[in-house]
Regions:
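N-terminal beta1-alpha1 cap of cysteine-dependent amidohydrolase-like domains
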Residues: 1-94, 100-102, 108, 112-124, ...
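DNA-recognition element of transcription regulators
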Residues: 148
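Catalytic histidine neighborhood in serine/cysteine hydrolases
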Residues: 181-185
Length: 217
């Protein structure tokens, strides 16, 4: 395989787990928020982080915190570039929310059952249900424990997006696909999934994304 790069649209101090998985999949990671750099990459990861500026989905702030508007702008610009150029995108935690907002969707600024999903002394774990005809089903089967560290959640879905994984207790959307574009997103954190608690690994998801990147390169 020729040298291929996957961009990670975040800060170097917060993306070490992501770069490790990108390297494990045989790609060169490039942590950048510059669309000029992303133009030379074959894939994009939108990583976890704080909450998205509510104005970007048409709302005032009524529960969002740890907002970095400048970062949001750069991440959404990175996503838009990939969208227009059909470059595969993987969104993780905040990243899935960026995908949704970037396609016109909205966010619960504080999910009604956030106590089930938010970070306490560490990630919480809960079961999920996976849609049978989705890309996740061959990787993880019909049910899968996932790790949660979020208090927000997807609300109205953006154009072309489809939910493929849910928390059965409260219908929180845990993963997305797109009807025609190479866009995938998960609300959980595959880069730090505890194999002892989840009984599986996040590596399968990263390997799937790697195959998507190769297919579109």
């Amino acid at each position: 395989m020729p040298d291929m790069q996957i961009a990670i649209a975040g800060k170097k101090s917060e993306t070490k787990n992501y770069t490790a998985y990108v390297e494990k999949c045989g790609f060169t990671p490039l942590v950048t928020l510059n669309t000029g750099d992303i133009a030379h990459c074959q894939g994009l990861i939108l990583p976890g982080g704080g909450d998205i500026t509510p104005a970007f989905f048409g709302e005032k702030n009524h529960g969002s915190k740890n907002i970095d508007t400048e970062l949001d702008i750069l991440q959404l610009q990175s996503f838009d570039y990939c969208l227009r150029n059909r470059i595969p995108v993987l969104g993780i935690c905040k990243g899935i929310q960026l995908i949704n907002v970037g396609l016109g969707g909205s966010i619960y600024q504080h999910f009604p059952s956030a106590e089930r999903h938010c970070c306490l002394s560490g990630d919480q774990y809960h079961n999920t249900t996976i849609q049978k005809d989705s890309f996740l089903y061959p990787l993880y089967g019909s049910h899968m424990p996932v790790n949660s560290a979020h208090h927000q959640a997807l609300k109205e879905l953006g154009s072309g997006l489809k939910a493929i994984q849910w928390c059965p207790e409260d219908s929180c959307i845990e993963a997305l696909g797109h009807e025609s574009l190479p866009l995938i997103g998960v609300q959980w954190h595959p880069e730090r999934l505890d194999e002892n608690r989840a009984k599986t690994s996040g590596e399968a998801l990263f390997s799937y994304f790697a195959s998507l990147v190769q297919a579109y390169a």
